[in-house]
């Protein structure tokens, strides 16, 4: 399973990604939030035992942290997407500018289970979004955004305007939910230590919070305790390593920060009802992790409710 890391910069970054082949499931570790648009092909996003399908023409959001994705080229055409990465500070600055300079009243009343539980969102791009990313594609091809942070900031401002002035939806909710810089900092530290051999107390210290304050804020954001959340994230990563690599069980346990193999096997069995070896034997194959009917239905339902 291939891995990529996002290197944080001081400005929003806009880039195009092209892949002519299916590289399988890849791990992406984001230190910034991402808004993306699929020009050609399909993207699959994996979360635990579910798979979510993003199609050509879809606008999507990926929050900070680990994402497991697979990009599928279109028939006779490579997979192409445009990604816009930003921090909460950049988001705050641009939204404040839109509010003060243009009197834009920014509100969001959308709430759903997906917004609360998933670290991504997607919906079909509407006409102004399609035109915007077609223009961005031309700019990237011409190189007019290269080494020009002012141009990137202006494009980011336009994109945010198109989203926040649109009807309430999961992407808008996710976007506005990442304005809090303090929360952003806590999430960055938590995500960067998922596979570190440190205690919850040490993570709280790195967030400049008392253990009690950290646990309270953590529960507000994630709806569970730090210990349970970290174990779940490690098991999710281990499960994908089992079905996408030939690594030994002990090696996977170590890579996912479990103290020993027996402890890893015990927790995995508790979560998935079988040992890692049995899970690998049952689930490896070409049909593994196809989009579930529930996941596809949820995407369609969201699209209908937003565009209706």
Task: Pin down the residues of each PLM region.
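Amphipathic alpha-helices that form helix-helix packing interfaces
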Residues: 129-132, 136-139
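Terminal helix-turn-helix DNA-binding modules in bacterial transcription factors
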Residues: 188-192, 197, 201-202, 216, ...
């Amino acid at each position: 399973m291939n891995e990529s890391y996002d290197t944080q910069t001081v400005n929003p970054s806009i880039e195009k990604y092209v892949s002519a082949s299916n590289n399988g499931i890849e791990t992406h570790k984001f230190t910034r939030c991402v808004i993306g648009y699929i020009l050609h092909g399909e993207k699959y996003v994996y979360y635990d035992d579910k798979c979510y399908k993003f199609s050509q023409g879809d606008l999507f959001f990926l929050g900070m942290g680990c994402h497991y994705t697979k990009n599928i080229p279109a028939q006779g055409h490579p997979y192409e997407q445009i990604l816009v990465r930003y921090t909460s500070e950049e988001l705050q600055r641009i939204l404040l500018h839109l509010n003060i300079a243009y009197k834009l009243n920014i509100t969001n009343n959308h709430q759903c289970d997906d917004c609360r539980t998933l670290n991504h969102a997607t919906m079909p791009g509407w006409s102004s979004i399609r035109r915007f990313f077609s223009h961005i594609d031309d700019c990237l091809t011409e190189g007019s955004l290269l080494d020009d942070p002012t141009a990137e900031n202006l494009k980011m401002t336009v994109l945010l305007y198109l989203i926040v002035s649109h009807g309430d939806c999961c992407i808008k909710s996710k976007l506005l939910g990442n304005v809090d810089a303090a929360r952003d900092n806590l999430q960055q530290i938590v995500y960067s230590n998922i596979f570190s051999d440190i205690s919850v107390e040490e993570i709280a210290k790195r967030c400049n919070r008392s253990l009690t304050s950290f646990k309270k804020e953590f529960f507000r954001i994630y709806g569970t305790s730090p210990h349970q959340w970290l174990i779940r994230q490690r098991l999710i990563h281990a499960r994908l390593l089992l079905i996408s690599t030939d690594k030994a069980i002990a090696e996977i346990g170590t890579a996912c920060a479990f103290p020993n193999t027996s402890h890893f096997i015990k927790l995995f069995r508790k979560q998935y009802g079988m040992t890692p070896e049995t899970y690998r034997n049952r689930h490896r194959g070409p049909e593994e992790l196809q989009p579930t009917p529930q996941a596809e239905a949820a995407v369609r339902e969201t699209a209908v409710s937003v565009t209706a």
